UniProtKB/Swiss-Prot annotation:
<dbReference type="GO" id="GO:0010333">
    <property type="term" value="F:terpene synthase activity"/>
</dbReference>
<keyword id="KW-0934">Plastid</keyword>
<dbReference type="InterPro" id="IPR008930">
    <property type="entry name" value="Terpenoid_cyclase/PrenylTrfase"/>
</dbReference>
<comment type="pathway">
    <text>Secondary metabolite biosynthesis; terpenoid biosynthesis.</text>
</comment>
<comment type="similarity">
    <text>Belongs to the terpene synthase family. Tpsd subfamily.</text>
</comment>
<dbReference type="InterPro" id="IPR050148">
    <property type="entry name" value="Terpene_synthase-like"/>
</dbReference>
<keyword id="KW-0150">Chloroplast</keyword>
<dbReference type="Pfam" id="PF01397">
    <property type="entry name" value="Terpene_synth"/>
</dbReference>
<dbReference type="GO" id="GO:0016114">
    <property type="term" value="P:terpenoid biosynthetic process"/>
</dbReference>
<dbReference type="InterPro" id="IPR044814">
    <property type="entry name" value="Terpene_cyclase_plant_C1"/>
</dbReference>
<feature type="binding site">
    <location>
        <position position="381"/>
    </location>
    <ligand>
        <name>Mg(2+) 2</name>
    </ligand>
</feature>
<feature type="binding site">
    <location>
        <position position="377"/>
    </location>
    <ligand>
        <name>Mg(2+) 2</name>
    </ligand>
</feature>
<keyword id="KW-0378">Hydrolase</keyword>
<protein>
    <recommendedName>
        <fullName>Alpha terpineol synthase, chloroplastic</fullName>
        <ecNumber>4.2.3.111</ecNumber>
        <ecNumber>4.2.3.112</ecNumber>
        <ecNumber>4.2.3.16</ecNumber>
        <ecNumber>3.1.7.11</ecNumber>
        <ecNumber>4.2.3.113</ecNumber>
    </recommendedName>
</protein>
<dbReference type="InterPro" id="IPR034741">
    <property type="entry name" value="Terpene_cyclase-like_1_C"/>
</dbReference>
<dbReference type="InterPro" id="IPR036965">
    <property type="entry name" value="Terpene_synth_N_sf"/>
</dbReference>
<keyword id="KW-0479">Metal-binding</keyword>
Length: 626
């Protein structure tokens, strides 16, 4: 019987290798394939990877298609054994003192005690930028708003200089200001970048790429270009120019703190970046002498705070992860060898962008919803028969515990866990929203299963739909809505109906996010899906309608579509004067970023043995050295 091959770790930048600091041996299961070596900075460890060797004929005598997904990588007993010393009150007390001291740094800047009118704008922007990249900005919301209000006060159609009395604008301050102000919802136009082009329409630079100031300027230009809106040609020009410039720079110079920052941002961009991963990386380079603006900031205290916050959050992650693992174990899913077990990976994604300790319900709900969606994906795509799928879909629409009577045994357990978990999350949402939200959730799950039924019919009949038909259905079957809806309703952010309908399906926001994920996911999954008998994908449907195009042509076209959709989603999130605040949309937006992260190199949710496993190690299991 053929096994699903596990690809070796992709050849990537120095950055990715330096992020992997160590790993834990995983408890091997009885059936294993040759072990997968993973490189780390200090050593090489070996993890046993177990594959699901499901027989074509199941125990009930029914012939079924199989997925051959590798099994759970994270032993339940190993998860329960996790511990950390950072639960001690002394660490929280120290963090509280450091927060007060950092606030005093902001006060000194506001009072002009440590800066001058010649650098007061760039100083504020740099302070805000570093605090956000270190992952501690939640403690300084008022200070950040005050700093950005000040910068915006001096913003002009030509941008800004280093200070309010600089006399001339400069590209570094303007690019950093454009990015930071835009991300916080200020109405700033990218047209400010036009004045920094020469007579040939090119951004002006020196001929030798050795000046750290110029390199940092182009770096900030690249970062600004990542938050482009539709039809902003100057942002496209900025990204093309800065990408070429920075790649040439990285090829010429030795490893440094600045080059490591550039590598990280060029590797992860903004739409596949995760705040906790970025914070872990930035801690290793923060405070180096390549950051001259730091002269008025106590970088040691700021860095200590970031490290303490990172490690204190570990205790929260471990507590929540143990809960998730118990839920997975008690659900009986651990006995189902025909489905993917990615509960740990999904929780990790949530904890890498929802990093406020108070958002525990969001993280837990996200992990559970994602895992349930994945279990149903594997049932509808491969394991279930058409008759079973019709019965299960009808049972979910009844939404009654007695609806399991007509289901096969394996489906009874899945239905019960789905019913209980969705109702449980609805009760959590009722406390935070002050109203019953179960109907929102039920409608989302019904639409999800209806979209799967359509795909199952395509598989059973050998039908290859039109691209538009597949794409519209695929935006629902990806599962973005079911993974987003109940988690955001569990938060302490109010979502009245008029705001929720601007975020939930079929809103423009939801359609764009789901479209990005369906297109990107298909570029990573279509070959493996086709091998399992799932012929319909964005690639195959588009090729059918455009027979003159090669597979490579179509994949490149799909990537271009994703780039365009990302710009549109940027606008939906950040457009000024919107009746839906950014804070209400941010977690729904970050869910899209998190899923996108998993598709950066491959289908990280089917083959979770490489980058996604590294992410668990770096952000959940290993504390940062103090």
């Amino acid at each position: 019987m053929a096994l699903l091959s596990v690809a070796p770790l992709a050849s990537k930048s120095r950055l990715h290798k330096t992020l992997i600091t160590s790993a834990h041996h995983l408890k091997p299961s009885p059936t294993t394939i040759p072990t997968l070596p993973v490189c780390t900075r200090r050593k090489t460890f070996t993890a046993s990877i177990t594959m699901c060797l499901t027989a074509p004929v199941s125990d009930d005598g029914v012939k079924r298609r199989i997925g051959n997904h590798h099994s759970n990588l994270w032993d339940h007993d190993f998860i329960l054994s996790l511990s950390t010393p950072y639960e001690a009150p002394s660490y929280r007390e120290r963090a509280a003192r450091l927060i007060s001291e950092v606030k005093e740094m902001f006060t000194e800047i506001e009072d002009g005690l440590s800066i001058t009118p010649l650098n007061d704008l760039l100083s504020r922007l740099s302070m805000v930028d570093s605090i956000e990249r270190l992952g501690v900005d939640r403690h300084f919301k008022m200070e950040i708003k005050s700093a950005l209000d000040y910068v915006h006060r001096y913003w002009s159609e030509k941008g800004i200089g280093c200070g309010r009395e600089s006399g001339v604008t400069d590209l570094n301050s303007t690019a950093l200001g454009l990015r930071t102000l835009r991300l916080h919802g200020y109405p700033v136009s990218s047209s400010v970048l036009e004045q920094f082009k020469d007579e040939k329409g090119q951004f002006a630079t020196s001929s030798i790429q050795t000046d750290p100031g110029e390199i940092r300027t182009i770096f900030n230009l690249f970062r600004a270009s990542l938050v482009a809106f539709p039809n902003e040609k100057v942002m496209e020009d900025a990204q093309i120019f800065s990408t070429i410039y920075l790649k040439e720079y990285l090829e010429k110079i030795p490893l440094s703190s600045l080059s490591r920052q550039i590598e990280y941002v060029m590797e992860y961009g903004w739409h596949t970046n995760l705040p906790r991963l970025e914070a872990r990386h930035y801690m290793d380079v923060f405070g180096d002498n390549e950051m001259p603006w730091m002269s008025y900031v106590n970088t040691e205290k700021l860095l200590e705070l970031a490290k303490l916050e990172f490690n204190i959050f570990h205790s929260i992650q471990q507590r929540e992860l143990k809960h998730i693992s118990r839920w997975w174990k008690d659900s009986g899913f651990s006995q189902m060898n025909f489905v993917r077990h990615r509960h740990v990976e999904y929780y990790t994604l949530a904890s890498c962008f929802a990093i406020d300790p108070e958002h525990s319900a969001f993280r837990v709900s996200f992990a559970k919803m994602c895992h349930l969606g994945t279990v149903l994906d594997d049932i509808y795509d491969t394991f279930g028969t058409m008759e079973e799928l019709q019965l299960f879909t009808a049972a979910v629409k009844r939404w009654d515990p007695s609806a399991t009577d007509s289901l096969p045994e394996y489906m009874k357990r899945v239905y019960t866990v789905l019913y209980e978990t969705v109702n449980e999350m609805a009760q959590v949402a009722k406390k935070s929203q002050g109203r019953d939200t179960i109907n929102y959730a039920r409608h989302a799950w019904e639409a999800y299963l209806d979209s799967y039924m359509k795909e199952a019919e395509w598989i059973s009949t050998g039908c290859l739909p039109t691209f538009e038909e597949y794409y519209e259905n695929g935006k629902i079957s990806f599962g973005y809505r079911i993974c987003m809806l109940q988690p955001i309703l569990s938060m302490d952010i109010p979502f009245p109906h008029h705001i929720l309908q601007e975020i939930d399906y079929p809103s423009r926001f939801s359609s764009l996010a789901a479209g990005i994920l369906r297109l990107k996911g298909d570029t990573r999954c279509y070959q493996a899906d086709s091998a399992r008998g799932e012929e319909a994908s964005c690639i195959s449907c588009y090729m059918k309608e455009n027979p003159g195009l090669t597979e490579e042509d179509v994949v490149n076209h799909i990537h271009g579509m994703v780039d365009d959709l990302i710009k549109e989603l940027n606008w939906e999130l950040l457009k000024p004067d919107c009746n839906v605040p950014i804070s209400s949309k941010k977690h729904a937006f970050d869910i899209c970023r998190a899923f996108h992260h998993g598709y950066k190199y491959r289908d990280g949710y089917s083959v979770a043995t490489n980058e996604i496993k590294d992410l668990v190690m770096i952000t959940v299991l290993e504390p940062v050295p103090l």
